[in-house]
Amino acid sequence: MCTDNETKVIDPEFGFYGPMGFDIGMLISNYLMAYFSQPGHRDSEKLSEYQNWILKVIEETFETFRQEFKKLWNSERTGILFPSSMFEDQGDSSDFALNAMLEHIWQDAVAVCGIEMHRRVLSLAHNADFEEINDTKKRSKLEARNLMMGRELILNNKSIKNASELTSLAKKFNSENYL
């Protein structure tokens, strides 16, 4: 909060400098926690439709991010890391560098997503999607699925190549036979 005379920091623990994939990873983690918690909030008739919608939102969100990043890369890229003078000004494409950067951002996002899925279940900053499930047996099962998915994302962030693979993995961990 800033005024002409003073600046106050609220929740300074959230002041952070980190990987480019941090914000998109945090967003996806919240989508996934909503996805995994839904059996505690909906009847089976509407459950599948809603969960599939959440997974579609994840895929569309990252694709929108990718397209916007690509647009900005091509129109507003400045600085010393990937200057146009090294690529376009030499008659070369910067697509390889762009794709490498997007892959790196995705890998960071996947790992951050998994970490946040753990933090929101295991720390003091609980997730309302799970906390509001009154049936503790059901809640613990859904939280366990969430934690197992988060573990997979942390340990295998480099092998999950895109949002479609991530949502397929979510379906695997969400199956009735899992746990």
Question: What name fits each language-model region?
Answer:
Residues 1-24:
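Active-site acidic catalytic loop and adjacent metal/ATP-binding pocket
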Residues 84-179:
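Regulatory N- and C-terminal appendages and interdomain linkers associated
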